[in-house]
Amino acid sequence: EDLELILHPMAEEAKEATGSMGDDTPLAVLSDIYRPLYHFFRQNFSQVTNPPIDSLRENKVMSLKTRFGNLGNILDFADLTEENIYVLNSPILSNSQIEKFINFFGKNLITIDCTFSKDENLEIAIEKIKKISEIAVREGVTQLILTDKNISEKRLPVPMLLSVGAINTHLIKHKLRGYVSINAQTGEAMDTHSFATLLGIGATTVNPYLALDGLYQRFEKKLFGNYDYEECIKR
């Protein structure tokens, strides 16, 4: 359903799929079946604006550009960094972009495995992730890649939303957040709501590798007409 009803229209028509029947599914907290952690977050308030807050139609006043790197403390002149601040046009990274990203930053980047053994528990796994991230930042790392790609029958994933939120809060508590970017490489993110939730809770960029792999499989079946794969991803 995610591929056919959500991702396919976004790649083919460059817009989110719309529906008119409303959402009558139970709230995630009341559901008897598994629901992703993203479903537990709901928007409490919406503001209608005219003109719309839209990075495409109103690009003079609205942008999705994302800064990353060692931002330092902009209020402390003694702490201003001389390092370059890099900018992306979007916080969503394709699979090829994340590979270039990793190669570009080299030793200034660390990849943190956000999976854990069945012999561990979730709390211990999160504490381990927080400790690794703090040590890395104190040693001068400017890019954290949080990944759940090592998921297997023997290794369970820490929900990426928990991983990002825990590290973001932990680094803020220790006054280290401004020195590093948090980049989420996750197979959980399948729609704009999950992207927005990750970014809202502290991620700098998101690489939805599983969603992109799914779209590539549909592209190989020639389900996107005359569009090439890169064009579908950009759309």
Regions found by a protein language model. Name each.
Residues 48, 61-64, 68-73, 118-121, ...:
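Flexible loop/turn segments at secondary-structure boundaries
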Residues 80, 85-86, 129, 146-148, ...:
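A broad, low-amplitude sensor of folded, mature protein cores
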